[in-house]
Amino acid sequence: MFAKADTIPNTEKLFENSNGIAIWGTIGKHLGFVTNIRDSREWGTRQYPGVINFSREGLGFAQGGPDYLEHDETVAYLVANWNHLTLQFGKDKNQWGPGRFGQLALSTRPTSYDQIKLQYATDRLRFTFLLAQLQHYNDHTYFYGARKSKILVGHRLEIAPFSRLTFSFYEMMVHAGNNIEWAYLNPVMFFRSADHYLGDRDNAGMGGDFTARLPLSSRIYGEVLIDDISTRRLGSGFYANRYAWLIGMDMADVFKMQNFDLCMEYTRIRPFTYSHERDIDYRHFTTNLGHWLGPNSDLIALKMTYQVSQPMIIQMTFGRLRHGDNPLNANIGGNILQPWGVNGQPTNVEFLEGVLKKADLVTCMIKYEPLRNFNLRAEYVYSRDTIAELTRNELTLFFCVNP
C-alpha cells in the first residue's frame, strides 16, 4: 500500500507492506476452522512514537522506532454447529448493530480478541452469548509488565416477528481482571442486576436496535446504547446520562439504476459515554469497542455506491463531523480516557460543550479486480476543519493478492 497525505504545513508519504497466510476448511459435518495470519510493516515520513512497544488506534500490540512500526493481525478460531446451536472458540472480531458508518455496541474497528461465543438460531430468533478477554492500556504506550486484562461478557437477542422487521436487545459487561464472576456466566442473567448484587464494581451497558425493510428495495434502521442513565433527569445535561443513538436509511437500485445504492445515517453520542473511572472502560488496547466517533460527538453522512461492472466498484462518501473536546484543565466528557471526576466535576454537561471542532469529509474510492483475487484500490480523502480552517488531502493506492 502507498499513501500520500497533504496537509497545510507539509506533505508526508506513507508505505505499508502486509503479508500472511489464510487457511480455512471443515472437518466432518459439524466442525470448521479459520486461520488468517497477517504481518504488516509501515514506514514513511510520518512522525512515529519512537518507542519500541506501543499501541495505536485500530491496532493491538505494535513495535517500532522513530520512522516505522510493525504489527500483526491474527484471526484463528474453531466453530462447531449442531442443528440450531453454534459454538465458536478462538480469536475473532464482532459486530453488533446495523450501522453502516459505525456501530454503537461492538464494531470491527479494534483488533481481534480471544473469545467464546455461543449462538442459538431459528428462522425468527437468534440468541448470542459472548465471553471475551480484552487488553487494557491507560494510554498509547506499552511497557513490559504493565499489561492489564479485563473480561467482556455480553448477550444479544434478535427477534423477527415479521419477515420485514427485526428487533434486537443486548447487554454488555466489562469486568476487571482475568477471573470472571459466576453470575456473568449465566446467559439469561440480567447483567446490570448481577452487577448490583456484586457491589456495583463493573462497567455495564445495554441497548437495542431495529431494522425495517420498506418497499422500493429500501430499509430504515436505528440503534440505542445506554451506558448509564438517570430517568429522573432524562432530557437534561446531567453528566450520568451517558447514551448514544443512530438512525439511518439505505436504498438499492436508486432512481431505477441497477447496482446504484444510497445510504444516509446520523449518529449522536453524549458526553462521557464509553468512559469509566476505573480500568474497565469500553476499550480493547487503546481502541473503543463501540463507535469510532467517541464521546460528545455526532456525524451525519451520505454514501453512494455504484457497481459499474462485476470487477469494478465506485464509492463516494460525504460527511460532517462535530466534536466537543475537553478544554485545558477541564473535563466535559469529550475524551474516553477522562471519565467524570477528572479535571473538575461538572454535574451538568450539554452536548458538544467544550472546544467545538467541526470537519467536512469527502471520500472517493475505486476498487477494481482485473483477475480473480487480485485487487486494486485507489482512495482519495478530503477533510477540512471548518473551525481552524485546515485542509487535508490523502491519496491511498492499494494492491492486494488474496487466496
Where are these regions (language model features)?
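Exposed, low-structure sequence patches enriched in small/polar residues
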Residues: H71, P161-M173, N178-P403
